[in-house]
């Protein structure tokens, strides 16, 4: 199984909700316009962890995802390639790498509207039949 999800636009409201709730203090998130990062990036970058959150939601909302998935139980080998920015449209490319009686294993890639890789990781889902 391999699939590509819909795209989600990352908005300034999303950025403020995430950074305010988590109380980010690093200047790239708290004072971007006056930081050295504004010389490197034209737009406000998002915290990388937000992409993991978005990827989980995109995977879950995919209508052909296996119906016997109980829970996402592992994320590993996370590699951030480049930041996502406000107004980017991001989506998930997911590829099933292995299936066992208890688990599904996927490779996830989060990309932007320019098909640039933002994030790669491996995830493991527990199947319903194995929940206690």
Language-model regions: role of each:
Residues 1-3, 84-132:
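HotDog/MaoC-like acyl-thioester-processing domains
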Residues 40-43, 52-96, 105, 122:
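Hydrophobic beta-strand-centered segment that forms part of the acyl-chain substrate-binding groove
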